[in-house]
C-alpha cells in the first residue's frame, strides 16, 4: 500500500524538507522500498540528535550537490559573492557522525552560462521545467551524481541547498528509473512547497513559492503538471545510458527502491 506524505516525512531535529522515497506507487502496482533514499534541504540546522536519528534510520552516506562557493560562509572572491547573490546564505558542509561517508558532487555547472541564461529567459529556473533541458543538454553532471550514489555504501541521504531544484532533479531521475508512476513523482516534488516554508522562515529568506506558482500558471502549468510534462517528453534511462551511466549502475540505483 502506498505511504502517505506524512509517513514519508522525516522529522529528525534540525532537518528540513526531508522525506524518504519509499512507499511510492510503481507502474507494476508495487511500491518503492523505504529506507534506501532520503532527500533533504542542507543540514545547517541539523542537531546532534537529528544526525544520530538519521544514522539510526540506516543512512550511511550523505551526498552534497552544492557548488564549492555555496560552502564558504565568507566569499573567497567577488565571483563567489555574485554567484551567491540570489541563493540562501552559504554554509559549510555538515559535520557528520563517525562512520557516515560524505561526498560532494556538484550538480550545476555555472560555466554553462549561455544555458542558464536561456533557462532564466524561458522562466524555467526554480521550476521542474528545467529538468528536461539539463538532462538533454548537460547530462554529464547528473551522471556524475548518480554514479556517486550508485557506488555509495549503504543507504543515502542527498541534498542541495533548499532541497527542491537540484535535489528535485536527482529525485526525478531516481524515481523515473524505478518506474514510479508519473503522478507520484509529481506529487513528491510538490511536497517541497509546504515543507520549505519553515526553513525559509528560519533563514529569514524570501519564500518564492507564490512567484514560482504564478510563473507556472502563466505557462499553463501547476507544479505537478510541469513535472509530468518533463516525464512525458523524456526517456530518462535512455538519456542517462547515452551519457555514460551503465546498466549496472542503474540497477544499483534501482536496488534501493525496488
What are these regions (language model features)?
Residues 1-157, 162, 169-258:
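Cys-dependent protein tyrosine phosphatase-like superfamily
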